[in-house]
Curated annotation (Swiss-Prot):
[4Fe-4S] cluster 1 binds at residues 23, 27, 30. One of its GO terms (biological process) is Mo-molybdopterin cofactor biosynthetic process. InterPro entries: Aldolase_TIM (IPR013785), Elp3/MiaA/NifB-like_rSAM (IPR006638), MoaA (IPR013483), MoaA_NifB_PqqE_Fe-S-bd_CS (IPR000385), MoaA_twitch (IPR010505), MoCo_biosynth_MoaA/MoaC (IPR050105), rSAM (IPR007197). S-adenosyl-L-methionine binds at residues 29, 70, 121, 192. PROSITE patterns: MOAA_NIFB_PQQE, RADICAL_SAM. The gene is moaA. This is GTP 3',8-cyclase. Its EC number is 4.1.99.22. It comes from Synechococcus elongatus (strain ATCC 33912 / PCC 7942 / FACHB-805).
């Protein structure tokens, strides 16, 4: 089997596929100016195009697919997409990242279709603070989705919270207590600077090392990562059912173990979340006979992948916001 690899000795077995660039939340760290979409942008990838895309990437060694947005549950054909992705031989894991606003009543169907992992965005466990961060009053709906996911015993269930110095870090102990009796993982993501959130970033950034130092002092132990795992370093504790984690893109050598590629909701391959430029794959997603051309295009494009991003130099590439590419 072919294994995708770049010039920096990194292998890629994990694909993040955005299903839409539209989001119905207005998180200050992502869309501080609201969402401004180009009305002339191409149509979203269709189900047949998605199927051809996944089959091609599996032939290149991809084992895990994460469906992101924007907000992927805004797609009415989401269950069909999950089913199509899960049905491709070679796919070991189908994951979904969602804000949970309209997820509770769809989870059973998604699980039956082949969903094996859910990452739920939840930046606060307090309704008022949640609304202040996200611009949404759907806190109860998100919590209901989380409890439903626990009840359904999804194989992997994680909560993502963007680490914010004044808005949720003071409530860190609430998150830690939340996993005491719940078999979930809560991961804190360092706030990342984009072209749109400069002021917000300056006010709210906090290094993830602040959290890990506390956790290690409290007896939390690091867990070895799977080869298809994302960038989080997770920690376990004998007195807690759940886990804690940190995604720290500003830490040294963050990119040296990169194992994932991104395809936008319009079919463009993006080599780095904070890079520049995209490579259109859509012309090779129209028919199975184009498979060899698709594989060749992906392999050629991978030669342009750089060793790492330049966030530490305040260079966000051409990333205006995270909703466009799914974070």
């Amino acid at each position: 089997m072919i294994v995708l690899a770049d010039h920096h000795d990194r292998q890629f077995r994990y694909l993040r596929l955005s299903l839409t660039d539209v989001c119905n939340f207005r998180c200050g760290y992502c869309l501080p100016k609201g969402q401004q979409l180009d009305p002339q942008r191409p149509a979203l990838l269709t189900l047949p195009e998605i199927r051809h895309l996944i089959e091609g990437f599996v032939a290149l060694g991809i084992e895990k697919v994460r469906l992101t947005g924007g907000e992927p549950t805004l797609r009415s054909d989401l269950v069909d997409i999950v089913r199509a992705v899960a049905a491709v031989p070679g796919i070991r894991r189908v994951a979904l990242t969602s804000n949970g606003w309209n997820l509770r009543d769809r989870l059973a169907d998604l699980q039956a279709a082949g969903l094996t992992q859910l990452n739920l965005s939840l930046d606060s466990l307090d309704a008022a603070r949640f609304q202040a961060i996200t611009g949404s009053s759907r806190f109860e709906a998100v919590m209901a989705a989380l409890e439903q996911a626990i009840a359904l015993r999804l194989p992997i269930l994680k909560v993502n919270a963007v680490l914010l110095k004044t808005l949720n870090y003071p409530q860190l102990s609430d998150f830690v207590e939340f996993v005491r009796d719940r078999p979930i993982s809560i991961r804190f993501i360092e706030l990342m600077q984009t072209l749109d959130n400069h002021d917000y970033f300056q006010q709210e950034f906090l290094s993830g090392s602040v959290l890990t130092e506390q956790w290690l002092a409290q007896g939390w132990q690091p867990i070895k990562r799977d080869r298809t795992a994302g960038p989080a370093q997770e920690y376990c504790h004998p007195n807690y059912q759940g886990k804690l984690g940190i995604i720290a893109p500003y830490s040294p050598n963050f990119c040296q173990n990169c194992n994932r590629l991104r395809v936008t909701s319009r079919g463009a391959l993006r080599l780095c979340l904070f890079g520049t430029g995209e490579f259109d794959l859509r012309p090779w997603l129209q028919h199975p006979d184009q498979r060899s051309q698709l594989l060749e295009q992906v392999q050629q494009t991978l030669s342009f992948k750089t060793a790492g991003h330049q966030l530490a130099e305040a260079n966000s590439g051409d990333t205006r916001n995270l909703a466009t590419y799914g974070g």
